[in-house]
Design a protein with these regions (language model features):
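Glycine-rich, small-residue loops and helix-cap segments
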Residues: 13, 18, 95, 99-206
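Acidic/polar loop patches that form or flank catalytic/metal-binding clefts of enzymes
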Residues: 22-31, 73-79, 143-146, 163
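Residue-level preference for alpha-helix termini and adjacent loops
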Residues: 3, 52-53, 57, 64, ...
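Gly/Ser-rich, acidic/histidine-flanked active-site/gating loops
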Residues: 1-72
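Short, solvent-exposed polar/charged micro-motifs at secondary-structure junctions
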Residues: 36-45, 90-92, 173-176
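N-terminal leader/propeptide and maturation segments of large enzyme subunits in energy/redox metabolism
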Residues: 52, 58, 64-125
Length: 206
């Protein structure tokens, strides 16, 4: 909870209290082994936790999908899509930018395949086997509880399920602050229940 805001900590304390009242057994701490491992090879946060898997897969699979659409499609590759967006910027194609597309398109699907495979193995091992699997099996847990969507990254990389339950609204304290007169509304705050592979039925049951 060190990175949570004070309102976030208050909400999480309330969540834990309600779960306890409903009969849940809260195990705290339940540290992710790959986060606390002193060996850099086995530490999820080493090297900034960077992985090429999402970007590589995006380019590979997007190009493969475009090939299935036939000749009527106006763009045939991710590169062509990026170029089309740039050419039509005045029409609003880049309202939110395309940094994710740019990063993916920088990869070469042949030359970078080796790095992708290494990163994929590391993602599965540190997020899954030495991460979620290990802590849940060692402590005999039904689920891991995360504030908001903070557990989405560690569960997404090995393809594990997460159920996010809306719970409250909390005050927003942006840094830097918003301009004077800006009416900043409270933001929604949910809690995430994450499990091991194929544990969706148990998560929904909880």
């Amino acid at each position: 909870q060190e990175r949570l805001s004070e309102p976030g900590r208050t909400v999480m304390a309330e969540v834990i209290q309600i779960l306890t009242q409903q009969g849940a057994t809260i195990v705290d701490p339940a540290d992710i082994p790959s986060v606390t491992d002193s060996d850099a090879e086995n530490n999820l946060l080493a090297n900034g936790n960077e992985s090429s898997v999402l970007s590589y897969g995006m380019k590979r699979d997007f190009n493969a999908w475009l090939e299935t659409l036939g000749e009527s499609v106006p763009v045939k590759t991710l590169t062509e899509l990026r170029e089309w967006n740039l050419a039509h910027e005045l029409a609003g194609t880049l309202k939110y930018g395309q940094a994710r597309l740019d990063g993916a398109d920088e990869l070469d699907l042949e030359e970078d395949r080796g790095k992708y495979e290494v990163d994929r193995e590391r993602d599965l091992r540190l997020n899954g086997e030495h991460g979620i699997d290990e802590v849940m099996m060692n402590l005999k847990l039904d689920a891991l509880l995360f504030p908001g969507s903070s557990g989405a990254g560690i569960s997404a990389r090995p393809g594990y399920p997460t159920v996010i339950v809306p719970f409250a609204f909390v005050a927003t304290d942006p840094d830097p602050p918003m301009p004077a007169g800006f009416d900043l509304k409270p933001r929604p705050f949910g809690v995430s229940f994450t499990g091991m592979a194929c544990s969706e039925p148990r998560l929904l049951q909880l």
